[in-house]
């Protein structure tokens, strides 16, 4: 019965008019992210130890709490018994694979912070022929369904945890960036997943942006990944909500 929900979700997705029969939604098809096995297994060890009360789950932006965001992490999040389950380059389908292969098994966190999906929107720096390939190019709706599947898996594994779904961060120089627009469209959908009881939604995008929608390189030098200043902004924007969920 492990994949029953996933199978039903996939069938419903493929039957939807949003998706043609020849365009499967890769965002909900669990697949190993090659080269990440060692880090994945380290998460399984943490899960079995069962000590973490707060888990951050996501892609490179989450992963980099151990890099550009480390000073902020050590000051604010480490004292809360937090664990970092971020893997650079991960998409929703990679997180689903991880959840199917031991992540969170035996772990009973009080809260989970989830942000995933910008790599489903598009990988920075990939050749155009790959970006145009359906495996790499998801619609906002497809990405949102992938996030919904992750939520279902997390709730099954950690029924008592409160999950904070973060809006996908803004990217690109300004509001005309197509990847940013798609992230915003995804956020508009996943906002509806919050029930105010076990699942919550928080979008901190405006904290990174200028009044005209410009994304400053002083916060995200590559217009995608925050620097240390950006991690402080992120931390400050969600700290109160996360601590509320940990009570």
Annotate each predicted stretch with a short phrase.
Residues 53-58, 81-86, 110-116, 120, ...:
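Structural recognition of the beta-strand scaffold that forms the well-ordered cores
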Residues 54, 85-88, 92, 136, ...:
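Solvent-exposed, acidic/flexible segments
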Residues 63-78, 92-144, 153, 164, ...:
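Oxyanion-hole/transition-state-stabilizing segment in secreted/luminal serine hydrolases
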Residues 147-152, 187:
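Generic structural signal for well-ordered alpha-helices
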Residues 49-50, 77, 158, 194-197:
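A structural signal for short coil/turn segments at secondary-structure junctions
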Residues 1-57, 61-75, 243-247:
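N-terminal secretory targeting modules
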Residues 41-55, 96-106, 151-155:
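Short amphipathic alpha-helices and their capping/turn segments at secondary-structure boundaries
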Residues 169-247:
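Catalytic His-Asp segment of secreted/periplasmic serine-dependent ester chemistry enzymes
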């Amino acid at each position: 019965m492990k994949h029953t929900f996933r199978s039903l979700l996939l069938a419903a997705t493929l039957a939807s008019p949003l998706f043609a029969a020849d365009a499967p939604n890769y965002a909900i098809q669990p697949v190993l992210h090659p080269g990440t096995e060692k880090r994945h297994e380290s998460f399984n060890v943490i899960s079995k130890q069962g000590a973490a009360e707060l888990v951050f789950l996501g892609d490179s932006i989450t992963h980099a709490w151990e890099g550009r965001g480390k000073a902020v992490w050590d000051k604010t999040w480490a004292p809360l018994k937090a664990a970092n389950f971020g893997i650079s380059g991960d998409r929703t389908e990679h997180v689903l694979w991880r959840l199917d292969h031991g992540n969170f098994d035996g772990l009973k966190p009080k809260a989970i912070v989830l942000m995933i999906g910008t790599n489903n929107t598009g990988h920075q720096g990939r050749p155009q022929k790959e970006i145009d390939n359906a495996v790499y190019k998801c619609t906002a709706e497809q990405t949102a369904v992938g996030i919904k599947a992750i939520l279902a898996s997390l709730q099954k594994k950690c029924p008592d945890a409160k999950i904070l779904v973060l809006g996908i961060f803004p990217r690109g120089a300004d509001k005309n960036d197509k990847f940013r627009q798609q992230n915003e469209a995804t956020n508009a959908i996943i906002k509806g997943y919050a029930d105010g009881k076990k699942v919550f939604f928080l979008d901190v995008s405006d904290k990174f942006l200028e009044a005209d929608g410009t994304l400053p390189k002083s916060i995200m030098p590559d217009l995608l990944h925050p620097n240390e200043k950006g991690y402080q902004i992120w931390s400050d924007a969600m700290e109160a909500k996360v601590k509320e969920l940990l009570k």
